[in-house]
């Protein structure tokens, strides 16, 4: 599911998305309003704030209102990291899946002005600043940098209950690769790609999830480089040699230099083939990228180039 939510579920400025020991945190202190009207005083859930004079509540804005905000303390967590979404095909309800230092939170945002915190799936092992979530066939697939975490599989149909603030349990734990930084899923093929684990030098690990409750590793790829993030698609771009092939676009780091993109044919999971590797100058940290809808362009996001180079 590729959806863009303009509901600000929470603010997670504390931790950067990349795992680097020397990550910097930038503090922005402007003369902003200090309070927003709460819709739930007991739980400090903040209500709607219109974008006026470039500010919605305490946040800069440009043409978008802040519909609501759930602070981290409502989840009884200290840090947030990543988020994904799920739309229930049975009733059209929309949910936010929020990565936390101690687990994953599930929030019903069908009415974005009155979000409902449904509960948390605790981390499989210990806390970590890094967690990533993707969805396939009404299941959430979750990895974390927490040691020994592996892959959690969670049946999202549990969210159809009217109960709130529950503590959930995962349906499956695949512990074959330990910790990992990221996960990508190609819904067309039913394969997940675990990224930045201890296997394959941190390269992608191929996991068959067509049966979500029975995931299993079928292979992987090592280019002697760490894959931080990836997008995997059934390619329908201008290069006819790879039409309908399953192609991985990876944001990589090689030899400590965080400046690489790899393009990999993963159609045959037993025999993945490198199509191209690209390195660029003035790099800070090759963080993530996304293809245009026509698969003609890959838009790369470097996390730190403006910070370290200017």
Name every feature range the model reports, one short phrase each.
Residues 13-16:
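C-terminal motif of bacterial Sec signal peptides marking the signal peptidase cleavage site
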Residues 1-4, 19:
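Positively charged n-region of N-terminal signal peptides that target proteins for export
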Residues 18-310:
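Feature marking well-ordered beta-strand scaffolds used for ligand recognition
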Residues 7-8:
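Sec-dependent N-terminal signal peptides
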